[in-house]
């Protein structure tokens, strides 16, 4: 009887020990998986780990602090687009003299008496908050066929006017690009802006004002080349060519690799002003395949382009589906980086499933701001399996722009 009780007691002890040891091992695995954040891994190795935000989010210090754990750069979802800076419905016109007093850039070939007023108030607030919190920002975007007021392309800045000629539009384009960029780099917080999506989705423009004025040759789009040249001239003026970079940004780039390469090479004919490609990455576990996507990534790298993953989200059929795809995707991205690929930034398009433009799809690796999903651990695991744990590799240094205007000033 005593032997039976002893054996029974020992069995319970062993069972209890097994439970505790299993719990300990699971806890240890979970702890290891969650012990590193995106800044310690991707931010350190690639230089920048980013996210998409809106100004109202930045006003909440709790949200900012949560975002900073995984990001050192942000992209404003809407507030820097032409519709938001210029107003979409009708132009608020001011005289050229008043524009000069406000610090706008007026090209010497600008023949009109008025320019549209640019409303910087919201974006200035966002840039200031980022500056105060040590966050950098991507300028998104200067030239786009969408979310750009139609009156910008028409006579007298009127929605009912005829389309202007190319000479007039050239002057308007130079006015806008240089006024927007110059506004930031002439101010206190200019060092916040380190990248610009100068032109967005040109290959997908249809029936736009840009095409109405300049024609529809997408891989040799004259206005795109001019926009990059104007933007680069601003960098030259403020001595920022070594610390701020300009990108062409587009979606479905894996389906249009050759056209993207042709366009960027055209932009850089005569002088390299475009650093490379922003690969918008609105992906799905059903399409594109991981191999299809990374074949495009490697094609851009072989073409000599710097590549940034700019708008990443992944539609999926559930956590298991997302976990598997995210792990394989980042294994391939990290392999490209390890093989010497010039990939300098990865930006998720939203801080959580609750703040995404894709409703009911749960395409991100956070369920709520600061609350990681299992896919987050898979993304980190893909990193540590490739590069090792933080501390075992050399972090990628980043450069803070120090805008210094040259004597050329503004006309």
Swiss-Prot record:
GO terms for molecular function: endo-1,4-beta-xylanase activity. InterPro entries: GH10, GH10_AS, GH10_dom, Glycoside_hydrolase_SF. GO terms for biological process: xylan catabolic process. It catalyses: Endohydrolysis of (1->4)-beta-D-xylosidic linkages in xylans. Residues 34-382 form the GH10 domain. The active site is at residues 201, 311. B.fibrisolvens is located in the rumen of ruminant animals, where it contributes to the animal's digestion of plant material by hydrolyzing hemicellulose with its xylanases. This is Endo-1,4-beta-xylanase A. It comes from Butyrivibrio fibrisolvens.
């Amino acid at each position: 009887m005593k032997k039976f009780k002893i054996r029974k007691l020992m069995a319970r002890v062993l069972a209890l020990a097994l439970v505790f040891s299993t719990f300990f091992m699971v806890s240890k695995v979970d702890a290891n998986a969650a012990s590193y954040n995106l800044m310690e891994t991707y931010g350190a190795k690639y230089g920048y780990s980013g996210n998409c935000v809106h100004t109202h989010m930045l006003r909440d210090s709790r949200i900012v602090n949560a975002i900073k754990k995984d990001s050192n750069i942000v992209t404003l979802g809407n507030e820097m687009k032409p519709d938001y800076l210029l107003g979409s419905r009708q132009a608020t016109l001011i005289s050229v003299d008043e524009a000069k007093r406000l610090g706008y850039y007026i090209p010497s070939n600008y023949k009109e008496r008025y320019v549209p007023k640019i409303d910087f108030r919201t974006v200035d607030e966002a840039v200031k908050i980022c500056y105060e919190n040590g966050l950098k920002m991507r300028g998104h975007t200067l030239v786009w066929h969408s979310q750009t007021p139609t009156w910008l392309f028409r006579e007298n800045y009127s929605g009912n006017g005829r389309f202007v000629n190319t000479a007039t539009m050239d002057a308007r384009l130079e006015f806008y690009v240089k006024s927007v960029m110059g506004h930031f780099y002439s101010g206190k917080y200019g060092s916040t802006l380190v990248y610009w999506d100068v032109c967005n989705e040109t290959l997908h423009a249809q029936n736009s004002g840009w095409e109405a004025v300049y024609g529809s040759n997408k891989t040799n789009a004259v206005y795109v080349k001019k926009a990059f040249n104007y933007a680069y001239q601003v960098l030259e003026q403020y001595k920022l060519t070594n610390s701020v970079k300009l990108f062409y940004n587009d979606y479905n780039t894996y389906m249009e690799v050759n056209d993207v390469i042709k366009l960027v090479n055209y932009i850089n004919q005569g002088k390299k002003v475009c650093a490379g490609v922003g690969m918008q990455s609105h992906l799905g576990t059903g399409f594109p395949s991981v191999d299809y996507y990374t074949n495009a990534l490697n094609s851009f790298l072989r073409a000599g382009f710097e590549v940034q993953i700019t708008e990443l989200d992944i539609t999926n059929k559930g956590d298991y589906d997302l976990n598997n795809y995210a792990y394989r995707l980042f294994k391939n991205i990290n392999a490209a980086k390890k093989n010497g690929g010039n990939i300098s930034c990865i930006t998720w398009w939203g801080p959580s499933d609750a703040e995404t433009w894709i409703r009911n799809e749960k395409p991100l690796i956070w369920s709520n701001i600061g609350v990681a999903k299992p896919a987050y651990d898979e993304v980190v695991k893909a990193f540590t399996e490739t590069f090792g744990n933080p501390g075992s590799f050399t972090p990628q240094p980043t450069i803070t722009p120090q805008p210094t205007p040259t004597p050329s000033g503004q006309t």
